[in-house]
Structures are given as structure tokens and as C-alpha cells.
Design a protein with these regions (language model features):
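A periodicity- and composition-biased signal for non-globular, repetitive helical segments
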Residues: 13-14, 30-31, 398, 406
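Hydrolases whose catalytic domains are alpha/beta-hydrolase-1, hotdog thioesterase
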Residues: 149-152
Length: 424
């Protein structure tokens, strides 16, 4: 399940944080991709895909247009969220309850996304009387494997949660397939094909599911995923509520499926996706969690609320981060060869980058508390550092079942949440 199932999480009004790359075992395949350079003389063995050329000036203009559109999208989403927040504020105030805005951020992590799926199932079991019970989220975002989880978490009903868990408990052998004996040839668009992943997205994110998503987001709630635009070298976050409505209106589900596949597409390993005539790959290249790292403080949700409603107190904001990985890799004696060195370096850097992003989110919350007198809470959960896969390999049922069980146990225990940033 590719980067989409890569060990790497989500919100559009938040710009992406640092990159957490592909899963530990899938990273080993990256070395095979590098070998392709050794076979450049074989490129004539098959036709290469071609794309219309663009000059530098055209690309710079395209980037400027994209930046403008992204800014406009962010403003619209912020506006929707503020309206949604005000409606929630009024409802809770009428009931004599303090208003709370809940934001779920789901990371990537490959097959280790089974942990997040299980965690949500366990969390769903927590009594509603518990102050840390699973809420209805005002915003849900995901990257890579988090992209698969996010729609189900957004809907939040038991049927959706069970459907998500069932998917992670039953990995298909065709989720990832090598292209054959000459899979490494540079003319191939990727080392592997993902027919199983494509099938799962078609089957689970069908028109009925899209109608549910559009209905759930009609009041301004947000569901968003991150992708990486390789042509422009930058992130692009897609609002899946808007995309779901577009699919319903047009009857065309291919676009939203391509967006999800792009968010899940490990560069070079899985096929890239062409969206709006541009090349897109794994969102984790530009942000394993999307949390607002590039947004100015005056554009943050607490600041926007103060501008819109200066005479009302800022509602409480709660950020819930599910990291489908361990913040620190398990210690090992690395083999003395370049393949092992590359694998271990990428693995270590991706986790360190995500830890830095989480620390940044905690720092941003502290700034809102100090500058805006806002009540902002951040909680994070991750796979325990002492956990180890029961069997080697990627997308193995025994490992994914183990992670679902672990996640479910931890999710049912609200003490699993940490309100402190990673300290190492």
C-alpha cells in the first residue's frame, strides 16, 4: 500500500511539516531504483512515457498561479472552519458546555497504519463521560496511510471504524506487485504496480462513501490530505469534502481516487499520478504531518477567531496526533554496505523530522496560549519504542493484526496519550 501505507499525517489550513519517508522495509527497495542508473543503456528496450514540455518561465508562472490558488483555498477553508467553530460554540454554549474544537492529525506509516486503525477502534470504546473520549472531529487530515484512515475517522461511526479495521486486517497479496524481471528499467514509471491498492480505494471510497463525506462536511468540517507536486517541488493539500462533492456532481470518481493514490505513492516505487497535468507523489515527501508550520501566527485559527468575534472568548482547541511509527528506530548494527546505509539514513531522518514537526506543533500551541490567551492542547500517541514486528516483510497479516491489537488496547486506555513533545 505504498507510501499511502508508508510509515508517515493531516489539515489543509495547516501547511505541511517535515517529511517522514516510506516504511522501513519498503525503503530497501529504494536501492533497487538507484540501480536503474546502471542500466541506462537499456532504455531502448521499451517505450518511455512522455509529457508535454514546459519552459522555465511557464513553470514559474504555473507555480505563482498554484500559490495563489492555494492561498485562496486556505482562506475559504479557514472561513468554513470559523463558521463551523461558531456553530459549535453556540450549540455548546446553549447547553452550558464549554466549546471545544477537535483536530485529528494522522501520520503515514505504511503497513504500520494498522496501529492507527486499531487505536481509533479502541478509542471509540471509551465512555463518553471520559473527558478524553473520542469526539466528533471538526477537522481530520491524513498523509499516506493516514490518507486511507482519514475518511473513516472523519465519518466516525462504528460501521466506518469497523470497515477501516477490517481493511488493515486483511492485506492483499496484490497490494504491491513488482513489474517483472526488468522492473528496474528507467523507462518504467515505477518499480512496482499497486493493483490491490487501487482496487481497495475504488471499493471503499465509492460513490456512497463520497456522499457520506460530502454530507458530513456540509457544515464546514474539514477532511484533507497532503500530496507532493513534483513538477513544482512543493506540497499541495486537497480538500476531500470539496473533491467528494465534485465527484458527486460530475459522476467522475477518478480524480479523488488519483488524489488518494498520489498521497500514497512512494516516489519511484509506486506509480506517480498526473493531476491537472502535473506530476504528484507521496504527500510525506513534503509533510508527514500537516500542522500549520508555514502559516503566520496571525492567520492561525485562534487569531482568525479573535478577528471574527473579538468580543467572544476563544474556544478550546485540541490537537490529537496519531503517529503510525516509532519516534526512534530500533537500535541495530547496520551492515557495512551502501544499501544498508541509505536505508538506515532515510529511516532515521524521516522519524527525526516528524519528531521535530511535533515539537513545533507544541511550540505553536504555547505561542497561542501566551499571545492569545487561548486554551490549546496537543496530545500525541505513537507505536511504543519496544515493539518489534513479529515477522519480517511488508504488509504481512501477522504484523498488521498485531498492530491493530496493540492500537486497540492503547486506544481504549486514554493514558496512552502524551501531552509532552518528544524529548530525545
Amino acid at each position: 500500500m505504498g507510501s499511502f501505507m508508508c510509515r508517515k499525517t493531516a489539515l489543509v489550513f495547516f501547511s505541511p511539516g517535515p517529511f517522514a519517508a516510506a516504511s522501513r522495509r519498503m525503503l530497501a527497495l529504494m536501492s533497487a531504483f538507484m540501480l536503474a542508473g546502471c542500466f541506462f543503456m537499456l532504455t531502448g528496450c521499451g517505450p518511455a512515457m512522455t509529457r508535454p514540455p514546459r519552459d522555465r518561465a511557464g513553470l514559474e508562472k504555473l507555480r505563482a498561479t498554484e500559490d495563489e490558488q492555494t492561498g485562496e483555498t486556505n482562506r475559504k477553508i479557514l472561513g468554513r472552519l470559523i463558521e463551523c467553530t461558531k456553530a459549535e460554540y453556540d450549540r455548546r454554549a446553549a447547553a452550558g458546555q464549554p466549546p471545544i474544537i477537535d483536530i485529528l492529525i494522522i501520520s503515514g506509516g505504511g503497513d504500520w497504519g494498522a496501529f492507527g486503525a486499531g487505536f481509533l477502534k479502541g478509542w471509540k470504546k471509551v465512555s463518553s463521560q471520559d473527558p478524553l473520549a473520542m469526539p466528533e472531529f471538526d477537522a481530520v487530515t491524513g498523509v499516506s496511510t493516514g490518507t486511507l484512515i482519514a475518511p473513516f475517522a472523519f465519518l466516525g461511526d462504528q460501521k466506518s471504524i469497523d470497515e477501516m479495521v477490517n481493511l488493515y486486517r486483511n492485506p492483499g497479496e496484490d497490494w504491491v506487485k513488482e513489474r517483472g524481471f526488468l522492473y528496474f528499467l528507467p523507462n518504467n514509471i515505477s518499480l512496482a504496480e499497486v493493483p490491490g491498492l487501487e482496487r481497495e480505494i475504488r471499493n471503499h471510497i465509492n460513490m456512497d462513501k463520497l456522499r457520506q463525506i460530502a454530507k458530513a462536511g456540509a457544515d464546514g468540517r474539514l477532511l484533507a490530505v497532503n500530496t507532493t507536486n513534483l513538477d513544482l517541488g512543493q506540497s499541495r493539500v486537497f480538500d476531500l469534502v470539496t473533491e467528494a462533492q465534485h465527484a458527486i456532481d460530475s459522476g467522475d470518481v477518478d480524480r479523488i481516487h488519483n488524489i488518494m493514490l498520489a498521497s500514497a505513492g512512494i516516489p519511484g516505487i509506486f506509480p506517480f499520478r498526473i493531476i491537472d497535468d502535473q506530476m504528484y507523489v507521496d504527500g510525506a515527501v513534503t509533510g508527514n504531518i500537516i500542522y500549520g508550520g508555514r502559516i503566520a501566527e496571525e492567520d492561525s485559527l485562534p487569531a482568525q477567531w479573535q478577528k471574527a468575534y473579538p468580543n467572544l472568548p476563544i474556544p478550546k482547541f485540541r490537537y490529537w496526533v496519531i503517529f503510525n511509527n516509532q519516534f526512534r528506530p530500533v537500535p541495530e548494527v547496520v551492515a557495512p554496505n551502501w544499501v544498508a546505509a541509505i536505508r538506515r539514513s532515510l529511516e532515521t531522518s524521516s522519524r527525526a523530522a516528524t519528531a521535530t514537526a511535533v515539537r513545533h506543533l507544541f511550540a505553536m500551541a504555547e505561542i497561542s496560549r501566551l499571545k492569545r490567551k487561548a486554551d490549546v492542547e496537543v496530545r500525541v500517541v505513537s507505536i511504543p519504542s519496544d515493539w518489534f514486528p513479529p515477522v519480517p516483510g511488508t504488509f504481512k497479516k501477522e504484523t498488521m493484526d498485531n498492530l491493530v491489537d496493540l492500537g486497540e488496547k492503547m486506544g481504549a486506555d486514554t493514558s496512552s496519550w502524551s501531552n509532552e513533545p518528544p524529548s530525545f
